[in-house]
Amino acid sequence: MENVFIYRYTVLGSKKISNLIFAIFIFLGSIFFLKASIFSFLDLKTNSLNGNIVFFPQGLVMGFYSLLGLLFTFYSLLTFFLKIGFGYNEFNKKENVIRIFRWGFPGKNRRIEACYSINDIKSIKISSNTGPKNISISLKGDIDIPFIREGFSDSFSNIEEQAIDIASFLGIPLVYNQ
């Protein structure tokens, strides 16, 4: 990595196939709940599991849950297709800059970009507290900027490997924060 001046990798954000599959399952469950709610309201009997559901309160609650599920499905599909959180982390030795870029929701601030000088970086920090593990850039002045979380990568070992690669590329220390 001595002759390489730019180290760049993409961050998937919400554009993962597991999010799409999860949204499809929530959609199917919501449709089943909506069907059960409508059939209980119209007092129709079916051969499925909802044979004896009274509209008030069970059918009404199932209708409410189905609407919540459909809204959640819409939100999940919207974040998937708009690539919310998708972006890249770029470490550029030639320009002496670290660039963190992500896509946000449509609007005035859809493009989220943060640039920092490599000279301002004190260390790369791996936090492994009880919550989700993450990598952050520790700037001079005790400012930590997280840029990779455990949920956005495959596993914690991949996060550690990326942190080691970044620290060795930049020539700065790697710190484990327990």
UniProtKB/Swiss-Prot annotation:
One GO BP on record is: photosynthesis
GO CC annotations, alphabetized: chloroplast thylakoid membrane; photosystem I
Q: Which UniProt keywords apply?
A: Chloroplast, Membrane, Photosynthesis, Plastid, Thylakoid, Transmembrane, Transmembrane helix
Q: Which domain of life is it from?
A: Eukaryota
Give the record's membrane topology: Multi-pass membrane protein
Q: Where is the protein found, in the record's own terms? A: Plastid, Chloroplast thylakoid membrane
Where does the chain cross the membrane? Answer: 21-41, 61-81
Function as written in the Swiss-Prot or TrEMBL entry: Seems to be required for the assembly of the photosystem I complex.
Q: Write out the similarity annotation.
A: Belongs to the Ycf4 family.
The protein's name in its UniProt record: Photosystem I assembly protein Ycf4
User: In the UniProt record, what gene is named as encoding this protein?
Assistant: ycf4
